[in-house]
């Protein structure tokens, strides 16, 4: 883009229009949406802060755009000079403005994706453009299985109704956007979608324009920064809000679409309401691994809160159902029940309901039955509320629902009766939707998983054995531990009494088990043991559950994360299955969790991905040998560095036979908003998971050939070696990492309740995977994603040039390898080593500059080798739409990168001299108050010069929005 053209451009959206490819399809509204939102925002910025500040925003954007054109580092310096000349208040406003513009760009993109999707559905075109790499549609999957793969419709239906996808919401601290802003973003999205509807009237348009202006201004006027860290209860409430807003209604709507898709392949049955197609679990308030803020009291609170929320949502729907169920014809079975209830209800207290507040006559039998359901739901909700507030309730247990079977029974009775009286069409309306909600969400809304480190259980058992004076459990061999645990599990005597000496940590573990015993069993899902390495880790949890009187013990799930643990996992699980007591206990079913984050941090992405692939194959073979059905629980993050990527591609690239209709997967942090933030996103997410799980089971991907395996094994060794050589053995690395990235400042964002380190001191090993990825994402260098790939590819090609052809063939024909390469290519497209070079120049000591240069040379070499294997000349050659979307963001992100680098310089070096130009934000009528200065007052206790800390945090949030992930 020539400089003279840039000088003539009046606004940012004019530059955006220059980025439009020569030919854009009619349904491509992205530029239009983007420009509309930005025009509105820049007008708001001018109204609030004056023309001078708006011009500074445009000047920064233009310098960034010039840099993006030629990657001339001088442009970054010019941009840095503009940004460092701003006074503290203006600096905050500029960082906030660019962060806000990136959020608006994301919203424009989401509306555009939904628009393209609708266009495709209208055309009946599912395989258009990028859909092959981003979508997995249930109807298209059914048609593909029946018509292309010659599966019978009955086979498809049978596989579908027996499959389960369990989505596990976790409070991983990667959601950097406050809930207050997420809600405003949702309203902006709605306004934008409605503005581009075909049948909009002029009055509608005017009102929507006003609403859009109002919401954009409200979002900009909201403090983006969390001033205090969230508690686990805050995280749980935030996670559960998605159920209230989209998931609750989204599940029956999705299942109705599945019914329609089945009808279109010739199946005239509906998916049974109790078929477990979709289930939801949570770690919010249950994941205590490294988080001291998750206490037994927190676990109890979140379970009761979820129960109260579930009862409240059912209660709010039951009167609508009563209105619909006005029929008088019913089966004898239902009539007898209705008459009994009518007689007994006259003696009960009358509750002051809004509708049906008087006793329902027996001539409306369905309403009588549902009226009793309403009473019990009311009591269920109130009892949970009392227990939450006061620990006791005077509502007797017999007047509430304590398990889901009690709740389903009267609803099933109504359904059977309607069908028996020829009213199936009515039964299959709202009543079926309600039954499906009850079957999906139960009384607990989600099932809470408990996660704890194996060492904490060892501490408890060591205290017990020392108290019993039989030795130190911690010092026993694995054989001796197993022998003692099995002997105790087979016996009946209590293992310890109230006189057991307890440290605070031991009491915490035991009190957690007591909470499991106290609350209804349907509150809980799995008990996950992190850092599990041997059968005794699993048996220890079984014994502690028994000793604490957990009536229905939770299934125990070992979690294997690091490379060595993944390699040893199949043997460990085989030893576990060899124990007769345990084999009888699990009834032919076992779950194993595999961790993507820590394995990547431990060995690099290539080696971790390959070891995760092999571990799954071997674990499935072990399970088959012992006659056990194994469910894999995938602990995937949102970023590629932590196992993220498009959902259906991730599923379809898993090894054959490793899913077979049963899948658990974590949905973490910002991914929850991206997957469930809107109704259409929720619908699309449920489609992707269900369709891809079905397709993987009925049309498994190919197995790798022996020569591919051998090459992958060799390359993984080299990749791990180079990765560890640099990350763990290179003496300069830790210092370089801490200086070149904002890792040390990450904790100031107050994203999550969990500390960023497992141990307060220590190096890279003790750093959690999220801040590790976060730090490199902020500098757009993405080192954890690509490091090791270059060494592996170079070794393979130099060893034998034929290996290049083999790698190219693997890319074309093997889904696992293709997905692995494509995701790294996407990360390279988001990367920019020029930003890393600027950080080095400003923040890193001169003696480390050569080290930074060698890493950037490695980056370029790896990128070129990757393109050669993919057969691409340029990054994202095969996905021009994604490339366009990323280009639209680059200039905003670059401004924030430069702002961040110079702000870090000023924070870390208080002697760094800058010269402020005059204050440019306009003043209010009274001269003492400047709007930009008001921002400084939001953080009066900062330990740095005024405005620096907030400017830094705003750049972090903006870059996270631009990269569309945090950690």
Swiss-Prot record:
Keywords: Carbon dioxide fixation, Cytoplasm, Lyase, Magnesium, Phosphoprotein. GO terms for cellular component: apoplast; chloroplast; cytosol. L-aspartate binds at residues 642, 674, 830, 889, 965. It holds the Pfam family PEPcase. It is found in: Cytoplasm. Expressed in roots and stems and at low levels in leaves. Its EC number is 4.1.1.31. InterPro entries: PEP_COase, PEP_COase_bac/pln-type, PEP_COase_Lys_AS, PEPCASE_His_AS, Pyrv/PenolPyrv_kinase-like_dom. Activated by the allosteric regulator glucose-6-phosphate. Inhibited by malate and aspartate. Up regulated by light-reversible phosphorylation. It catalyses: oxaloacetate + phosphate = phosphoenolpyruvate + hydrogencarbonate. It is an enzyme of class 4 (lyase). The modification Phosphoserine is found at residue 11. D-glucose 6-phosphate binds at residues 283, 451, 598, 636, 666, 754, 768-770. GO terms for molecular function: phosphoenolpyruvate carboxylase activity. GO terms for biological process: carbon fixation; leaf development; tricarboxylic acid cycle. The active site is at residues 172, 601, 642. Its cofactor is Mg(2+). Belongs to the PEPCase type 1 family. PANTHER family: PHOSPHOENOLPYRUVATE CARBOXYLASE, PHOSPHOENOLPYRUVATE CARBOXYLASE 3. Homotetramer. Through the carboxylation of phosphoenolpyruvate (PEP) it forms oxaloacetate, a four-carbon dicarboxylic acid source for the tricarboxylic acid cycle. This is Phosphoenolpyruvate carboxylase 2. The lineage of its organism: Eukaryota, Viridiplantae, Streptophyta, Embryophyta, Tracheophyta.
């Amino acid at each position: 883009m020539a400089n003279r053209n840039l000088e003539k451009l009046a606004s940012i959206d004019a530059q955006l229009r220059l980025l439009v490819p020569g030919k854009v399809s009619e349904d491509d509204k992205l530029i239009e949406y983007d420009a509309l939102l930005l025009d509105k925002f820049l007008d708001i910025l001018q109204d609030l802060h004056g023309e001078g500040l708006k011009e500074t925003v445009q000047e920064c954007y233009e310098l960034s755009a010039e840099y993006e054109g030629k990657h001339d580092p001088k442009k970054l310096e010019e941009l840095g000079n503009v940004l460092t000349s701003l006074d503290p208040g203006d600096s905050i406003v500029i960082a906030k403005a660019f962060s806000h513009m990136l959020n608006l760009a994301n919203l424009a993109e989401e509306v555009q994706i939904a628009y393209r999707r609708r266009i495709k559905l209208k055309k009946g075109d599912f395989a258009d453009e990028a859909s092959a790499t981003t979508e997995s549609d249930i109807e298209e999957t059914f048609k593909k299985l029946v018509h292309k793969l010659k599966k019978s419709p009955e086979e498809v239906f049978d596989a579908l109704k027996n499959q389960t996808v369990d989505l596990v919401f976790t409070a991983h601290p990667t959601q950097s956007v406050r809930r207050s802003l997420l809600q405003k973003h949702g309203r902006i999205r709605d306004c934008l979608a409605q503005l581009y509807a075909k049948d909009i009237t002029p009055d509608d348009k005017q009102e929507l324009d006003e609403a859009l202006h109002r919401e954009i201004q409200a979002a900009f006027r909201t403090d983006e920064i969390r001033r205090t860290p969230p508690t686990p209860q805050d995280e749980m409430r935030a996670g559960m809000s998605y159920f209230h807003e989209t998931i609750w209604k989204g599940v029956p709507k999705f299942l109705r679409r599945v019914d329609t898709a089945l009808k279109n392949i010739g199946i005239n049955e509906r998916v049974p309401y109790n078929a477990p197609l979709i289930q939801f679990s949570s770690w919010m308030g249950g994941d205590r691994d490294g988080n001291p803020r998750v206490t037994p009291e927190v676990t109890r609170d979140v379970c009761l809160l979820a129960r109260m929320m579930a009862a409240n949502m059912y209660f709010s729907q039951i009167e609508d159902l009563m209105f619909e169920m006005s029929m008088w014809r019913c089966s004898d079975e239902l009539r007898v029940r209705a008459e009994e209830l009518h007689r007994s209800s006259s003696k009960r207290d009358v509750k002051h309901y809004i509708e049906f507040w008087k006793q329902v006559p027996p001539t409306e039998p369905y309403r009588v039955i549902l009226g009793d359901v309403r009473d019990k739901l009311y009591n269920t909700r109130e009892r949970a509320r009392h227990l939450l507030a006061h620990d006791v309730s005077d509502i007797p247990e017999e007047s509430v629902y304590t398990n889901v079977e009690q709740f389903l029974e009267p609803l099933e009775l109504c359904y059977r009766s309607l069908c028996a009286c020829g009213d199936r069409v009515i039964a299959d309306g709202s009543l079926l939707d309600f039954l499906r909600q009850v079957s999906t969400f139960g009384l607990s809304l989600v099932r809470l998983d408990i996660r704890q480190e194996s060492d904490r259980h060892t501490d408890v058992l060591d205290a017990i054995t020392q108290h019993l004076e039989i030795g130190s459990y911690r010092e026993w061999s694995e054989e001796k531990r197993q022998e003692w645990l099995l002997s105790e599990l087979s016996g009946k005597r209590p293992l310890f009494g109230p006189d057991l000496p307890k440290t605070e940590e031991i009491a915490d573990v035991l009190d957690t088990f007591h909470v499991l015993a106290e609350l209804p069993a349907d509150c809980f899902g799995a008990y996950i043991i992190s850092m599990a390495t041997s059968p005794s880790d699993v048996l220890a949890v079984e014994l502690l559950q028994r000793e604490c009187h957990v009536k229905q013990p939770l299934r125990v799930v070992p979690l294997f994360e690091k490379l060595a643990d993944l390699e040893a996992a199949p043997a460990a699980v085989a030893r576990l299955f060899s124990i007769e007591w345990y084999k009888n206990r699990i009834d032919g079913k076992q779950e194993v969790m595999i961790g993507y984050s820590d394995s990547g941090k431990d060995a690099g992405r290539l080696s971790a991905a390959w070891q995760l692939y092999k571990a799954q194959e071997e674990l499935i073979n072990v399970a088959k040998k012992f006659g056990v059905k194994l469910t894999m629980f995938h602990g995937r993050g949102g970023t590629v560095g932590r196992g993220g990527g498009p959902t259906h591609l991730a599923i379809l690239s898993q090894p054959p036979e490793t899913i077979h209709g049963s899948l658990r997967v974590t949905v973490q942090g910002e991914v929850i908003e991206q997957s469930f933030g809107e109704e259409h996103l929720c619908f699309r997410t449920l489609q992707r998971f269900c369709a891809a799980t079905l397709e993987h089971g009925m049309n498994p991907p190919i197995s790798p050939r022996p020569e591919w395996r051998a090459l992958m094994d060799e390359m993984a060794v080299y990749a791990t070696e180079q990765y560890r050589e640099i990350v763990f053995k290179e003496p300069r690395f830790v210092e370089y990492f801490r200086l070149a990235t904002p890792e040390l400042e990450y904790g100031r964002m107050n994203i999550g309740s969990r500390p960023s380190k497992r141990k307060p001191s220590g190096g890279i090993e003790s750093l959690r995977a999220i801040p590790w990825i976060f730090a490199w994402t902020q500098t757009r260098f993405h080192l954890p994603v690509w490091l090791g790939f270059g060494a592996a590819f170079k070794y393979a090609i130099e060893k034998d040039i034929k290996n290049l052809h083999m790698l190219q063939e693997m890319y074309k024909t093997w889904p696992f390898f293709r997905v692995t390469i494509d995701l790294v290519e996407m990360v390279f497209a988001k990367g920019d080593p020029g930003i890393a070079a600027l950080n080095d120049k400003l923040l890193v000591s001169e003696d480390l500059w050569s080290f930074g240069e060698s890493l950037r040379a490695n980056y370029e070499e790896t990128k070129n080798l990757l393109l050669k294997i993919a057969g691409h000349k340029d990054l994202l050659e095969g996905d021009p739409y994604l490339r366009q979307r990323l280009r639209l963001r680059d200039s905003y992100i670059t401004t924030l990168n430069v702002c961040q680098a110079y702000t870090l310089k000023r924070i870390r070096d208080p002697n760094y001299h800058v010269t402020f130009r005059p204050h440019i934000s306009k003043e209010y009528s009274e001269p003492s108050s400047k709007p930009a200065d008001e921002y400084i007052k939001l953080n009066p206790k900062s330990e740095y010069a005024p405005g620096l800390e907030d400017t830094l945090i705003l750049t972090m949030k903006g870059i996270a929005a631009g990269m569309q992930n945090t950690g």
